[in-house]
Amino acid sequence: MKLPDKVMNCIVVFNKDKDKVLFCKRKKEPFKDRLNFVGGKVEPGETSEDAAYRELQEETGISRRQIRLYTLMDLTYYHEDFMLEIYAGRLNEDVVLKEEYNPLLWLQLDEDYTDRERFAGEQNIAHIINIALMYPLPPLHETVG
């Protein structure tokens, strides 16, 4: 089966203490007015990793020097002809967020991320956060060990 041509990404951003996760409130469909991870499209000729850092910078003001992103997983939606690549990382410092388009907010880890009225992704967000929490996700200046 052929892989989809359209590739999107989403980025799970934890604060430096790894007790909060960053969300944006979507202003357009799909999932208008629901909370989701930041992310966007991988442009032609761009690597997936570069696209993740670019989208993070554009949507939040968070730069490569403030976070190390790790590839977490990908989901392929064959019937919708796109692949979603999921990255996760933990900030190495407190940051001042810069909203590009969608409002941004930090949420505690004990939120009900399965609430379909509040969160995008048909309950995928809860699963993604649980997977991300299984890994140490050391900040930029720490080594994996």
Task: Label the model's feature ranges.
Residues 134-145:
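C-terminal regulatory/oligomerization modules of transcriptional regulators
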Residues 1-21, 41:
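Conserved N-terminal beta-strand and adjoining loop/helix that marks the start
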Residues 13-15, 25, 90-91:
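Residue-level signal for short segments within beta-strands and strand-turn junctions
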Residues 3, 29, 75-79:
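A short beta-turn/loop motif at secondary-structure boundaries
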Residues 6, 32, 37, 64, ...:
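Short connector loops at helix/strand junctions that flank enzyme active sites
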Residues 20-58, 145:
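Conserved Nudix-box catalytic region and its N-terminal flanking loop in Nudix hydrolases
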Residues 73-112, 121-136:
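Active-site-adjacent beta-strand/loop module that shapes the phosphate/pyrophosphate-binding cleft
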Residues 63-72:
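A short coil-to-beta-strand element that immediately follows conserved catalytic motifs
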